[in-house]
Amino acid sequence: MGRAEEGGDRLRTLLYAHATARTSTAMLAAGVNFAIAAHGMEKDTGTMDASLLDRLRIREVIENWARWRDAGDWERFRTVWHAEGRMMATWFQGSADAFIAASRAGFERGVRILHFLGGSAIDVSGARALAQTKMTISQRADVDGVPCDVVCTGRFYDFFEQRGDAWRIMLRQPIYEKDRLDPVDPAAVPQLDRPLLAQFPEGYRHLAYAQARNGFAIKRDMPQLTGSEVERLYADGAAWLAGGPLAR
């Protein structure tokens, strides 16, 4: 082999060694960066898991509210509320204890008000949370001599507080978006009192009418899909999350 060929071989060897070293260095750097990123992901995941757990616990309370209220499981229904918890509804405004007593009395008389839940949006800030849950309220009632089903669509707007490991409701305020009334027998048509019907807010007009016809006093300024009442509710919710007092 001539000197030129030997020199070429040495050059190729040096170039190969240099390229290999650069590749190893790059791989090492990539490994370090990956380890750093993985460590950060572990930290972020830990935070995410705690937040997710809070939301799951809150959602469980929301679901238990509907299950236990509708089934008449009053002892367990009490556990979704804090001691000073309160409920607002078309037909009732007051403490959780008074709401449970009124609901139980109605249940025993045959009043049937059922709740179905959709998705929830839950905002958590420390030991406080706000939950908005899509829902329907369904009530079967006699309306002017005709058995009817009234269905109202809206949201539960819940003020939550965590004490220890337990998230419970401080205040539940429904938002009433729209409703309808249907006779159970399609051939039977109730003759509604139109002037009375027109007195109730659009978002819960038929629900209020049916409840009023069955002896309930109806609150006529409840939050609806739009309007000043729901805007005040949103403002109260923001203040609650920021650490302010419950202004309702």
What does each model-identified segment do?
Residues 1-12, 16-17:
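Extreme N-terminal basic, low-complexity initiation segments
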Residues 17-19, 35, 40:
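Short hydrophobic alpha-helical segments enriched in small aliphatic residues
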Residues 42-59, 166-248:
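Terminal "cap-and-tail" regions of soluble proteins that handle hydrophobic small molecules
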Residues 54-70:
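Short, aromatic-enriched amphipathic alpha-helices that serve as compact interaction elements
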Residues 74-140:
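A solvent-exposed, acidic/Ser-Thr-rich amphipathic alpha-helical stretch
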Residues 128-164, 178-198:
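Exposed beta-sheet edge and beta->alpha loop/turn motif
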